[in-house]
Amino acid sequence: MFNKLRISLPQAGLLLLCAAWLLPGLVGHAPWKGGDGDHFVLLLQLLRDGGVLQAEPPLYYWTAAATAWLTAPFLPLHDGARLASGLFIALTLVFVLRTARALYGSEAGWAAVLLLLGCLGLLVRGHELNAHTAQFAGAAMLLHGLVRVAQGTRGGMVFAVGAALMLLAGGAAETLLFLLLAGSAPLCFEAYRGAAARRGLAVATGATLAFAAAWLAFLSAQGAPLAAMLGLDRWFAPGNLEPAYYPAMLAWFAWPAWPLAAWAVYRERRQWRTPGIALPVLLLLGLLAMYAFVAAPGEEHGLVLLLPLALLGAAGLFTLRRGAANALLWFGLMLFGFVGLLFWVYWSAHDLGMPARLAARLTRLGMTDVGTLRPWAPALGVIATLLWIGFLTRVQRSPLRPVLVWTAGLTFIWALLMALFQGPLDRRHSYVGVAEQLAAQVPADACIQTYAVRATQRQLLAYHSGRFLVPADLGCDWLLIETRQREAEPHVSPNWVKQWEGARP
């Protein structure tokens, strides 16, 4: 069905591209507002409570604690912890590579990896403290086990290990979906009806159910909230159902994988009962059906949706017509070339003050260091730009070239953004600046009670300032109040005297 093409592409170069995508932005900045900070606060809670999380799936936080401990001599806690996301993304790439090779042939493996890294939605989510990257890796392992289980017990063991990771990461519903797919595979595919497949399926289901029973028994003995620990609270959280949220999100989140996936399904529509088409399609449809009933959906939960689309996209890439391939190629070249030029213009305004009108606009946006030259930033930016240009002059014509150029361009843009603007972004999106101002006003041994300060902000301010912040009145000598734009300042006792006010840029 699929051509097992042999394309001469240096493996080391592709590995370097993966590393270039993964490393920039993973370290070198404080926890940012949003998911990055939220997950870091949960890690602080785990470290404070001795490795126990009361209402969160633990796998990611255990791993983050381990990477933070291993890198403590040379990295801050938050940077070391963020490496856990890099580990889970790398594990995901390994199993996507192996799954695509098993389904479509050797060169389809790198096509699937490049398509996954080229998806716009993974770029930010894959570089922050993000517990859902653990589910991402578990799902990739489960999918590989599901594909290989027809060959015997080794595939069944991979499936079971992936299921264990998924359960520890809070993906009980996704694990159940994979079990249903495994159970129905003999009814749909002839390859799953042999003796080796029966042994593999027996190992997969038996080991998965045994681990699930042991995990449930442990959680029950600990008195943990089962819905939260298993990730089932997503379907019961307060919020409105948005059935169309994830299909609409995939239009940009999974670009450019989804058009290639759609082409593969159309091209192989007469072969729809083969595992290479049917398994990813059934997984995608099953996930979308489940996620349609998630209360308060969000991007983080959509990472798993990228896996079947990347696999199908790899299948479609090698049959893509020349006009469509050239369109993707030139669109990537023009888009990333324009964005790269735009970044350099903004760097010139930020560091050199030229053009003056743009520099004045950046100042009005709250950037306090406009006009201050940072020599290392343009040096790193020039290196990234020259590497990208050098890559474009050497990339060879092949079926992989459109997606290779796209992913390399996206990697260049991300690396350039981190090189030129990681410092300003850190000041704007983290609480370091506010915490430093707070620490300068309050003695190190002081107690600060807070009013209307959200728990995540309070703990991040305490982490960065080294001060003791509490949520209630414990007789502290200092009071910290949060007010928001367009809201009146809350009434406080006249006994309190304002000493300082500050805000993020």
Features from the language model and the residues they span:
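Membrane-integral, polyisoprenol-dependent glycosyltransferases
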Residues: 1-326, 461
